[in-house]
Design a protein with these regions (language model features):
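Non-catalytic DNA-binding core/recognition domains of DNA-processing enzymes
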Residues: 10, 18-102, 219, 272
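Helix-turn-helix DNA-binding helix
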Residues: 30, 71, 256, 292, ...
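Flexible interdomain linker/hinge and immediately adjacent N-terminus
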Residues: 90-150
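Basic, Lys/Arg- and aromatic-enriched nucleic-acid-binding interface segment
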Residues: 132-179
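A short, glycine-centered helix-capping/turn motif at helix boundaries
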Residues: 159-163, 169-189, 284-287, 296-298
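Conserved tyrosine-mediated DNA breakage-rejoining catalytic core shared by Y-recombinases
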Residues: 182-223
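Active-site/catalytic core of tyrosine-dependent DNA strand-transfer enzymes
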Residues: 218-277, 282
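Short, polar N-cap/turn motifs at the start of nucleic acid-interacting alpha helices
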Residues: 266-267, 285-305
């Protein structure tokens, strides 16, 4: 999609719209949505959303984008903005874009091979049973750590406890993103951090928090036992970070990725574990859904909804 020379990237209308979007979305998402809409408006700042009423033209414009994920991002931006505004005059138009977005998702889903992997994934992939086996090995190592070793700041012993806790977080519950646990502290407090109170995880800060709100999850008893033993041995206190407590500044969750890479000896981080988990859980489901949809005479989207 060719772009004309760019003028000023914003104006009063767009600034007001951004403030409205910030009530529902993060700053990054709000800015991204505005940028997508500006590009659809010939990369010119817009003073209304009237250009979106030319939905056939907009869809044709998006269809010229080669990358499927990029095409989806434009549709998502349009629907996201119109959903947030919820203006009756645009509801019919929004339904058109929603249908286009849903049709796109169904088309992509029909083409998905749940076992297909990127080059990086192929080079570093392990099955979920291998992840579980690695967890069992880490548990054996952690069980051998003594309180005396921890009190003497034995780095090997401390690392054994930390690595065991880290991988347990990704195996005893569906794997979450790095930041979700990197920003987790002990106790219960403000909404600027995530918390573990000895029984539950409270997630306030995560990628989709603006849309989903706070999430509270019961910690499985086996994981609770491991966490509480780790906290006791490491002498962690209220407000301390759960993981890598020496890292007070919390500059980057890359610390989590490096630790996971070290555990597996491969480029396996949170994202890869999420893919491995999803493949383990759903790998054989899509062919069944597709066959069922065909036999029932409706689309995959009907079953997915």
């Amino acid at each position: 999609m060719a772009r004309p020379p760019k003028s000023n990237v914003t104006n009063k209308f767009m600034d007001t719209l951004r403030e409205k979007l910030l009530e529902k979305y993060s700053a990054g998402t709000a800015n991204l949505y505005l940028t997508k809409l500006r590009i659809l408006n010939k990369d010119v700042p817009f003073t209304s959303l009237a250009f979106l009423k030319e939905h056939a033209q907009m869809i044709e414009l998006m269809s010229g984008i080669d990358n499927a994920n990029t095409r989806k991002s434009y549709l998502t931006a349009v629907v996201g903005v119109l959903d947030c505004l919820n203006v009756p005059a645009y509801n019919k138009i929004n339904n058109y874009y929603k249908k286009a977005l849903n049709d796109f998702k169904v088309d992509v889903y029909n083409k998905i091979d749940p076992n297909e992997k990127t080059t990086t994934q192929k080079d570093n992939w392990v099955d979920w049973k291998e992840v579980v086996a690695k967890q069992a090995l880490l548990q054996e190592q952690a069980d051998k750590v003594t309180q005396k070793e921890i009190d003497q700041n034995n780095l090997h012993a401390i690392q054994a406890l930390e690595r065991n806790v880290l991988l347990n977080l990704y195996t005893q519950l569906p794997p979450r993103r790095n930041n979700d646990y990197y920003l987790m502290r002990l106790g219960s407090g403000d909404d600027e951090s995530n918390w573990y109170d000895g029984k539950k995880f409270t997630f306030n800060v995560f990628k989709t928090a603006r849309a989903r709100g706070k999430e509270v999850i019961d910690v499985p008893p086996a994981l609770e036992k491991i966490l509480n033993n780790y906290i006791r041995m490491m002498d962690l206190r209220e407000d301390d970070y759960l993981l890598f407590s020496h890292d007070d500044k919390r500059k980057s969750p890359a610390t989590m990725t490096r630790a996971l890479n070290s555990i597996f000896g491969k480029k396996i981080g949170a994202s890869m574990l999420r893919h491995i988990w999803t493949s383990h859980l759903l790998g054989n489901v899509m062919p069944i859904i597709k066959e069922n949809s065909y036999k029932m005479g409706h689309s995959v989207g009907t079953d997915l909804n």
